[in-house]
Amino acid sequence: RDPKIAKIYPDGIHGAIAKYLRSRPGFEVRTAALEEPENGLSDKILNATDVLVWWGHMAHDKVSDAVVERVYHRITGEGMGLIVLHSGHYSKIFRRLTGTSCSLRWREAGEKERLWVVAPGHPIAEGIGDYFEIEHTEMYGEYFDIPSPDELVFISWFPGGEVFRSGCCFYRGIGKIFYFRPGHETFPIFHDPNVLKVIENAARWAAPVDRPRPATILGAINVKPLEKLS
């Protein structure tokens, strides 16, 4: 709706990300939008989804609670991956998964961001140098009210002096979640090769593992001993 944003992303942010991923081997991509029935995330669609990429801004409260619960159980109980981008930190699903407010400092001044790789052996950092820079972006700063990440891949620095945990991995149930900070809508960040490469890497990392689901994922079970008890 904003002409400035439409000029940067004529097919929407979701369209820009989808276009890139469709160009990469091994990806079959579809998009979902808030205004679609069930926010575009019906049981049928989610059951056919290995990894869900989530970007949202200003309309988090308009996402159906039923859809959020559906996504939550698909992640924790069935292993679907989730990638949360930028202002998606305030999405219902990310806060449901973290159990925290996910609040932070912010400033919109078009300043530079330098993202340092702090886990160089992590698959999400594959193909990325020691750091990369985004010339103009919105600042996010600590304290970021999230649980301590299970793995931290990137830390951002901003000229105003702030730092931010900008690439955070979490495990919930049998699902994998990656939060990635870059992505303010008024800048062409989702055309940046490094940003797109990280999203691609994260999607491959977050994809479900092909193995039987643990019996205890859906609830506690009473079991017989594997060995003879004396």
Q: Would you name each region that the model predicts?
A:
Residues 1-2, 37, 59, 89-91, ...:
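Short, solvent-exposed loop/turn segments at secondary-structure junctions
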Residues 1-49, 217-230:
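Aromatic-Pro/Gly-enriched surface loop or interdomain linker
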Residues 2, 44-92, 174:
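Short alpha-beta junction capping motif
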Residues 13, 66-69, 193-195:
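Charged helix-capping and loop-helix junction motifs
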Residues 19-22, 28-30, 47, 103-181, ...:
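Catalytic beta-strand/loop cores that center a nucleophilic Ser/Cys/Thr
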Residues 29-34, 57-62, 156-157:
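Short, flexible loop segments at the rims of nucleotide/cofactor-binding pockets, characterized by
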Residues 97-102, 132-149, 194-211:
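Oxidoreductase and adenylate-handling cofactor-binding alpha/beta cores
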Residues 164, 172-230:
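Extracellular ligand-binding/catalytic regions of CAZymes and related secreted enzymes
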